[in-house]
Amino acid sequence: MDIHKLTNDNYSLNNSHIHAHDFSLYAEDDLILNEHWKINAGLHFSFFNVQKQTYLSLQPRLSISFQATSNIILKSSFSQMSQCTQLLSTASLAMPSDLWVPVTRHIRPMKSFQYAVGVYYTGIKNWEFSIEGYYKDMYNVLEYKDGESFLGSSHNWEDKVEMGKGRSFGVEFMAQETKYF
């Protein structure tokens, strides 16, 4: 079990100060059903209070592994996540500039749902290979409106951003050599 204690965070944006309190708790367990099947289940609880607005979330995680042969493992997983600080990036300068911003009364936490499946192979001495595909749906993704950035006028930064949906997907390949000394 992992406990993240209550913290007081302060954010300064365009001469305004935002004070936030957060607390999180995470628990997980491995269940071995038999010599082939293994389940890892977890639950993350999050409390975030800012500007007299409280955001609570329960975020489940589940991973299932199947040992197909002595060298091949098949895995699938699901995770639901919520994030109360988001990274705003702008390319309006000659170099990228990033700004971390918290949720507020008007800006909701980003939420995502990720699914993954993969195959892992360990049949060659000191080597592990894997291929994994993933898909992620995201909600309340924050970005600057067209033509806006954190530079310039000092009016409310919340007026310069908009929320939307997003998705990402892909395939990851890995080859890893393990040496024991």
Q: Which positions does each model-derived feature cover?
A:
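Residue-level signature of outer-membrane beta-barrel architecture
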Residues: 30-31, 45, 56, 66-67, ...
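Transmembrane beta-barrel strands of outer-membrane/channel proteins
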Residues: 1, 41-47, 76-80, 98, ...
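Repeated loop/turn-to-beta-strand initiation elements of outer-membrane beta-barrel proteins
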Residues: 36-39, 71-74, 125-129, 181
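Surface-exposed extracellular loop regions of Gram-negative outer-membrane beta-barrel proteins
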Residues: 17-52, 57-61, 70-115, 135-160, 175-181
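Hydrophobic, lipid-facing positions within transmembrane beta-strands of outer-membrane proteins
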Residues: 21-27, 43, 58-64, 113-117, ...
